[in-house]
């Protein structure tokens, strides 16, 4: 069966930065990897950012936002069916920063995907400099995107003091409690380390961290009303002589 890993995290947490490092490691270990990028916006910017890791051992498929939940599930299911037929042995899914993780689990339980795929690891990316106050919708997403993680990896840990990393972990606990979840993280399940210093042993541990069965109380809201997608394109400066 094809092992599928899920990289979750809120908008801007650093999922794509980590994914590039993680996929590069998997390819070096001899895996044939396909990345499934799911962006909230109409333009799949994240797919552009992973181009550097593409090659004989890695490819990418994309799903862009702008559709209702049922349509989105059909598109993801279709992509996963097509990917299973291409001979990959590892699929790494980077969902949007406001993704409903339960939706992904439901898709994997469908026939024929339940015969082709097995869930490997769920790795949640959380900003070590997480703001103290978030909207109710963002607090819910923080909980729902980490609740099944085998490991939480703090981003920007090199910029944070130990007290700030501890505050981010405490914030995560509060979000889980507010979402009426019994899931709590043991100290070894939260990794605060400069990503430039991540070793192959660290990445191997993340690849094998697995996932946890847990649930929380659902918060239903209009994602497009609560969050806005923006796309910034690089514009080359025009010299004064050409104006």
Summary of predicted features, one role per range:
Residues 86, 90-193:
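Phosphate/Mg2+-binding loops and adjacent switch elements
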Residues 2-8, 13, 17-135:
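Nucleotide-state-sensitive switch-loop elements of NTP-binding domains
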Residues 151, 159-240:
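C-terminal accessory "lid"/substrate-recognition subdomains
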């Amino acid at each position: 069966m094809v092992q599928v890993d899920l990289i979750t995290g809120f908008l801007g947490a650093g999922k794509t930065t980590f994914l590039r490092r993680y996929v590069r490691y998997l390819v070096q270990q001899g895996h044939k990897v396909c990345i499934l990028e799911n962006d909230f916006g109409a333009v799949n910017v994240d797919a552009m950012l992973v181009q550097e890791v593409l090659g004989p051992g890695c490819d990418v498929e994309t799903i862009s936002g702008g559709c209702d939940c049922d349509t989105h599930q059909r598109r993801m299911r279709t992509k996963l069916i097509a990917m299973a037929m291409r001979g990959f042995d590892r699929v790494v899914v980077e969902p949007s920063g406001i993704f409903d993780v339960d939706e992904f689990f439901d898709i994997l339980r469908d026939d024929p995907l339940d015969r082709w795929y097995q869930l490997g690891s769920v790795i949640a990316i959380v900003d070590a400099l997480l703001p103290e106050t978030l909207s109710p919708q963002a607090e819910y997403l923080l909980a729902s995107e980490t609740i099944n993680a085998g490991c939480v990896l703090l981003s920007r840990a090199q910029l944070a003091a130990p007290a700030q990393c501890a505050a981010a972990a405490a914030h995560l606990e509060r979000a889980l409690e507010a979402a009426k979840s019994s899931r709590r993280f043991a100290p070894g399940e939260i990794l605060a380390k400069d990503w430039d210093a991540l070793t192959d042993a660290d990445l191997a541990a993340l690849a094998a961290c697995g996932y946890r069965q847990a649930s929380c109380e659902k918060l239903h809201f209009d994602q497009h009303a609560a969050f806005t997608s923006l796309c910034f394109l690089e514009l080359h400066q025009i010299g004064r002589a050409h104006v």
